[in-house]
UniProtKB/Swiss-Prot annotation:
GO MF term (any one): asparaginyl-tRNA synthase (glutamine-hydrolyzing) activity
Subunit and interaction comment: Heterotrimer of A, B and C subunits.
Keywords assigned by UniProt, alphabetized: ATP-binding, Ligase, Nucleotide-binding, Protein biosynthesis
Source lineage: Bacteria, Bacillati, Bacillota, Clostridia, Eubacteriales
Superkingdom, natural source: Bacteria
EC number(s) on file: 6.3.5.-
Similarity section: Belongs to the GatB/GatE family. GatB subfamily.
Protein known as: Aspartyl/glutamyl-tRNA(Asn/Gln) amidotransferase subunit B
HAMAP family xref list: GatB (MF_00121)
Amino acid sequence: MEFESVIGLEVHAELLTNTKIYCGCTTEFGGKPNTHVCPVCLGLPGSLPQLNKRVLELGIKAGLALNCEITKVGRMDRKNYFYPDCPKNYQITQDELPICRNGYIDIELESGEVKRIGIERIHIEEDAGKLLHTKRGTLVDFNRAGVPLIEVVSKPDIRTPEEATLYLTKLRSILSSAQISDCKMEEGSLRCDGNISIRERGTEPFGIRSEIKNMNSFKALEKALNYEFDRQVEAVTNGEALSVETRRWDETNNKTIVMRSKEQANDYRYFPEGDLVTLNVSDEWIEEIRNTIPELPYQKADRFVKEYGLPKYDAHVLTLTDSMADYFDECAKLSGDPKAASNWIMGDISRLMKEESTWIEDLKFSPKDLAELIEVIKEGTISSAIGKKVLEDMFAEGKSPKTIIDEKGLKQNNDEGAIRQLVNKVLDENPQVIEQYKSGRTRILGFAVGQVMKETKGQANPGIVNKLVTEEVEKR
């Protein structure tokens, strides 16, 4: 019997607001414990929430960016549960009337096939506090309590852990590019839970699902889903009964561990939040928000392929971050040579950034400077090899290519007469070149070219050197 996995993801993203969802406390990350709090986010008696309009706006913006239908009349609800990091003993969230429904994300599989992953709903809610486990006991920090979130719930359309990673990667790039969330997994502003079940391949009914928490990286997501698939297959194969449960990923031991039996919706006793008014969203406001959405990464990638003729792979890599996409876009327009711009950014510039642990926004030279480097190489002022050295100086000093070329005397030698003299000198000193060439070993010409380039310290035009070496060898 062959099994397949059925996977759905629930992704929580903290919204880019200055204040919390129901009060004026700051959302700044990293403050001293329990300093970004007030009676409202601590749930003290008599305090009343007031919805931050910016939260609703960003929720709608996320829905539009993810191809969702927007709910025109909605409400907030109470989700009742007890946990030490939930100060009110309930969370204000959305149940029956989420702000967005029925969206989708298209992912491109390794085969080149485009697969559509449905989005069931997006709702806005407040975050809980944070528990800190120590040897002395468990401490609680309420700074995060009340920080605004959206929860993006996918449909169970994902079939492999690799598809889950592609989906989450694209979701993160959209939310980040649209300035909805900074999506920093290391700070907890993007968190992902996975629901996974198995079934016999080719059948329709869903199996018994487990929810997996604590997947705080893309690698953890893929490893946890792979482990859970194997665990469930082994259990079913051995005749064991699966149960609906919540598990957490144990990074140290590379396995999932049972936390509790999975709750059902009625366990939370949802009911409308009476302290907040009904949400009314007009068509005019939706269009205003739609107009604030920038060109999204996948749209940029499509444009780079159509407008610049880039391969899909190049376009994908260049749009992994907005900064890199914008840098390339400007350089491509200024240089008129998109492929050269792509090669420099994906090649030598990325290598230098990796070596120095910097980002493209930290570069000391502008897209205009890179376009100038492409131009001087194309014009024959310097060779590609010298261009790599010039780039290293640009990276270190921030000077323009022409300034570096002038200061270091790097202009390419295009004087055919002078180069021909050097070619003959090299051939005279290395008679074996002629002998081997005449016997059919034409690759020996590369040695002669290399010797000429060595004599000129790399400044002779390699195209001219190649031509003259061939001419002079043929004469002898």
